[in-house]
């Protein structure tokens, strides 16, 4: 497992926006991770983190509190994929659509008048 100390939360959101890899997210926030799992589910984890952060209001929080909230959200997103696979979680639309119930096609309606 890789881990690093939490970076000083000057503006954690700005730092995360310029992060170039999933590993940087984990290092900036000080979240331990398994490199094997991250190699398989990196995009899924970051997408799920984004979904969770969409419900958060970090703009008016002090830097250390915003960093703590981001860390908690990343840990939660990572835990989702420790417990199950990206196929089970279906974060992306293409995976959701693959199992979406198909709407049955209705037979074409032909009025009796057209059968003359």
Curated annotation (Swiss-Prot):
Q: Which gene holds the coding sequence for this protein?
A: nifW
Q: Which family does it belong to?
A: Belongs to the NifW family.
> The organism sits in which domain of life?
Bacteria
Keywords from the UniProt entry: Nitrogen fixation
Q: Which organism is it from?
A: Rhodopseudomonas palustris (strain TIE-1)
The subunit field of the Swiss-Prot or TrEMBL record says: Homotrimer; associates with NifD.
Keyword DNA-binding attached: no
Biological processes annotated in GO: nitrogen fixation
Describe the function of this protein: May protect the nitrogenase Fe-Mo protein from oxidative damage.
Lineage, top ranks:
Bacteria, Pseudomonadati, Pseudomonadota, Alphaproteobacteria, Hyphomicrobiales
Q: What is this protein called?
A: Nitrogenase-stabilizing/protective protein NifW
Q: Does the keyword Magnesium apply?
A: no
